[in-house]
Amino acid sequence: MGYKDLKFSEDSLFLVTGCAGFIGSNLCEAILNMGYRVRGLDDLSTGLQKNVDMFLDNPNYEFIKGDIKDFDTCMKACEGVDYVLNQAAWGSVPRSIEMPLFYCANNIQGTLNMLEAARQNGVKKFVYASSSSVYGDEPKLPKKEGVEGNLLSPYAVTKMCDEEWAKQYTRHYGLDTYGMRYFNVFGRRQDPNGAYAAVIPKFLKQLLSGETPTINGDGRQSRDFTYIENVIEANLKSCLATSEAAGQAFNIAYGGREYLIDIYYGLTEALGIDVEPNFGPDRAGDIKHSNADISKAKELLGYDPEWSFDRGIKAAIEWYKENL
């Protein structure tokens, strides 16, 4: 169960790209707490400097400010690395619709640069962030690998392209790659600010600030919200997975289903705040329902998520109350 007792070689070096972001900084923290070395790479375009500064006093941590769109930077970052955890990407479905060229350059070319740099440097395992958005308009629930629909956004296209490139690097070059199809990850250090903030931290910040949150649509959308600790487990267990599991992508979720309106009222109750939400239009490119079949990750990665939504949301509420 979990990841804290996983064992790697004592001198193992992990490269975490996107290390100043939400998932990346949590991966850095977990690996450092386990006693292993971490090299972080981030251009700080969306990541936060404070998510780097918190580790700079740790002798096992090294930070490179750089852009995955630059191949030489990727080569430098991969020198001597055993495991790559490639989280560097721009998120947000709506923003990708506004900025398709940038998303292609950053999310596709950047990942390809990292794959090639990892290959040339003899990296053992390459674990990368994909997304549940690759399921597109496929209505069948739960979402199962191999049953994908039409893609609904440029962001989804970038993630599917990343998966296809990773498969090629496993097939032709023997690089063990593992795609993490994240389902609505939430938890500590997720940025609540800006027009593209994820719904849980955004609701929490607005409620704690005395604002009235707006729910896009009718609130009856459902998602498989996944606490950050489960995502850390999936990434680290992928680093220990067999080569037979390589060249594939895996649903990383809890396997539950929560409705936005229920989450909203759960947050107001937990915070002791009585305020009705506003309702706005549906977001472009969004699906109505999402729920993951995680049996493949359980079987091939040993993934066994410990953190339910209820347990995770309690931890998230406490973190935001202390840190906003």
List where the protein language model places each region:
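Short beta-strand->alpha-helix junction loop in the catalytic core
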Residues: G187-R189, A284
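Short alpha-helix within the catalytic core of nucleotide-sugar-dependent glycosyltransferases
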Residues: S45, I200-P201, I232-L236
